[in-house]
Amino acid sequence: MRKTFFRLCFELSSHPVLSSMLQAFTTSKASRWLIPSFVRVYNINGQEAEKPLHTYQSLQEVFTRTLTENCRPIDLSPKSIVSPVDGVLAEQGTLSDEANFVVKNQTYTLEEMLGGKEKAKLYREGTYLLFYLSPSHYHRIHSPVNGTIKEQWTLGNKSAPVNNLGLRYGKRPLSRNYRLLTELEAEEGRCIVAKIGALNVNSIVPTHQSEHVDKGEEIGYFAFGSSVMLFFEKGTIQLDHQPRAVEVKMGEKVGSWLR
């Protein structure tokens, strides 16, 4: 019962009234008494949190917690591409020559995902990775590569769940939900970090301050349930993992540049 309640709080309903009520509650001090239960239900490692868990003032503060320094070692190999988040690497593969990709038996077009034909053409036959974050995960987002931010834009106005059931039975939530997309240019090629929210504009908060970002540097955080997708140009990277769901940590190597 408690896990169902917490899942409602952080993955949220697509109904706007319920979503607003849950958001108001989880960000208020009234939710503080639920922190111990939340920590137990999701097995949150308090030793990793930057502050003692009893000092947080709301469920939201625990959910968006920062970690202690060096808690997540960054793979600094020159050619490495690292996971931008703690989560499940749920899907990965190659985009079709028509720039399509399939997640949970649903076909997505990159044109809809990125918001335009010209941008989609750049990544046709490229590589994609999908990371799903559950309420138990650390919800800060980090850069997967060293690079310069070339462009950042927002798309979408839906708020469907992006959990396993939402991805399977929802109406293309990855390309319809509100999302913040950041295109990075590295020496080896370009990539797009697509941060997909499950509530509204306030569910994704950018934190980077400069145009250049280092691999592993924080670039934002999710206030509520979420997913992240990475897109790379054709022939620029090689993936590390087999195409099956695998738990990964932020900073862990998930691929390599080929150039």
UniProtKB/Swiss-Prot annotation:
Record localization: Cell membrane
One GO BP annotation of this record: phosphatidylethanolamine biosynthetic process
Keyword Transferase listed: no
Pathway(s) this gene product operates in, as recorded in its UniProt entry: Phospholipid metabolism; phosphatidylethanolamine biosynthesis; phosphatidylethanolamine from CDP-diacylglycerol: step 2/2
Enzyme class: lyase
A Pfam family matched in the record: PS_Dcarbxylase
Post-translational note: Is synthesized initially as an inactive proenzyme. Formation of the active enzyme involves a self-maturation process in which the active site pyruvoyl group is generated from an internal serine residue via an autocatalytic post-translational modification. Two non-identical subunits are generated from the proenzyme in this reaction, and the pyruvate is formed at the N-terminus of the alpha chain, which is derived from the carboxyl end of the proenzyme.
This enzyme's EC code(s): 4.1.1.65
Topology with respect to the bilayer: Peripheral membrane protein
Sorted UniProt keywords: Cell membrane, Decarboxylase, Lipid biosynthesis, Lipid metabolism, Lyase, Membrane, Phospholipid biosynthesis, Phospholipid metabolism, Pyruvate, Zymogen
Gene Ontology cellular component terms for the protein in this record: plasma membrane
Major localization listed first in the record, in broad terms: membrane
One GO molecular-function entry: phosphatidylserine decarboxylase activity
Site (described: Cleavage (non-hydrolytic)): G225, S226
Active-site positions on this chain: D86 (charge relay system), H142 (charge relay system), S226 (charge relay system), S226 (schiff-base intermediate with substrate)
Cofactor binding note of this UniProt entry: Binds 1 pyruvoyl group covalently per subunit.
Reactions that this protein is recorded to catalyse: a 1,2-diacyl-sn-glycero-3-phospho-L-serine + H(+) = a 1,2-diacyl-sn-glycero-3-phosphoethanolamine + CO2
Positions bearing Pyruvic acid (Ser): S226
InterPro entries linked: PS_Dcarbxylase, PSD-B, PSD_type1_pro
Required co-factors: pyruvate
Coiled-coil parts of chain: none
Similarity comment: family membership: Belongs to the phosphatidylserine decarboxylase family. PSD-B subfamily. Prokaryotic type I sub-subfamily.
Function: Catalyzes the formation of phosphatidylethanolamine (PtdEtn) from phosphatidylserine (PtdSer).
NCBIfam families (alphabetical): PRK03140.1, PS_decarb
Assembly behavior: Heterodimer of a large membrane-associated beta subunit and a small pyruvoyl-containing alpha subunit.
UniProt protein name: Phosphatidylserine decarboxylase proenzyme
Native organism taxonomy: Bacteria, Bacillati, Bacillota, Bacilli, Bacillales
